[in-house]
Amino acid sequence: VIMAAGMGSRYGGNKQIDGMGPHNEVLMLYSIYDAVKAGFNKVVFIIKHDFEDRFRELVGDVVKGTVKVEYAFQELGNLPAGCSIPAERTKPLGTVQAILAAKDLIHEPFAVINADDYYGTSAFKTMVDHLEKLAPEKHACMVGYYLKNTVSEHGHVTRGVCDVDENGHLTSVTETYKIQPFPDGTIRDTEKDPNGVILNPESLVSMNFFGFTPWLFDKAEERFTAFLKSLSPTELKAEYVLPVLVDQLMHEDGLKVDVLSTDAVWFGVT
């Protein structure tokens, strides 16, 4: 599942379909080729109707001879029964809404990635091997990246900072919104303090490369519904994101998340 509907508020434009490779290839094409090489056999693109034609031309039609391709649409109005949002809201509702858009297309274990991140060939092989042995309920996995390999010299990034126990299970994931390197070589969280709180560069972080089973969907819908109902009418920007959902399911539903570490160096568009 490739989440490609985000608006890219900091980057501007549709960064998911801007050309970046040596021949102006779209970044996610590299991920798709790596995934197919590793053993994935279907890709579901989560996009918006307003750039569907361009997306099909630049991405979907390019790979449809290589892998089965399906489309799901993340639109603001796609809400669980009984939920509503303020008419003036324009910001997407987050990555949980994105994967829920694909609910009816997925009946097997699946991986989730961002369209605007490149994860490295080895990460896809690690993921596909683990998905093949994932228990059908209350189990998931996540490829963790070393924080030092995922920061940007060009501004702050958002990462899910992970705690992992001695058995390699995720114990918590904290969505951290303003991480950046400092001139002294440290990496800091600057969200609440401009001087920053120093983070361990060897910490594992989530880059939204998760592996799930279809068990997730009903749980995600329940939690997404609760999130929407908790919003005040004046809240126009709050999002419900995958690391927050995973953290809740671990603590409230007994979800076990195996952390698969990789030395791959991430790169993406921030």
Task: Please describe what each predicted stretch is.
Residues 1-60, 67-69, 74, 87, ...:
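N-terminal glycine-rich phosphate-binding loop and ensuing alpha1 helix
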Residues 63-109:
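Short phosphate-binding loop-to-helix
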Residues 204, 258-265:
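Catalytic beta-strand/loop signature of glycosyltransferases that borders the donor
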Residues 221-255:
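A C-terminal functional module that forms or caps the active site or interfaces directly
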Residues 209-220:
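Conserved nucleotide-sugar donor-binding
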Residues 121-210:
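Conserved core of the sugar-phosphate nucleotidyltransferase
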Residues 108-118:
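Short beta-strand-to-loop acidic/aromatic patch adjacent to the donor-nucleotide binding site
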Residues 8, 118-120:
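A short, conserved beta-strand element in the Rossmann-like catalytic core
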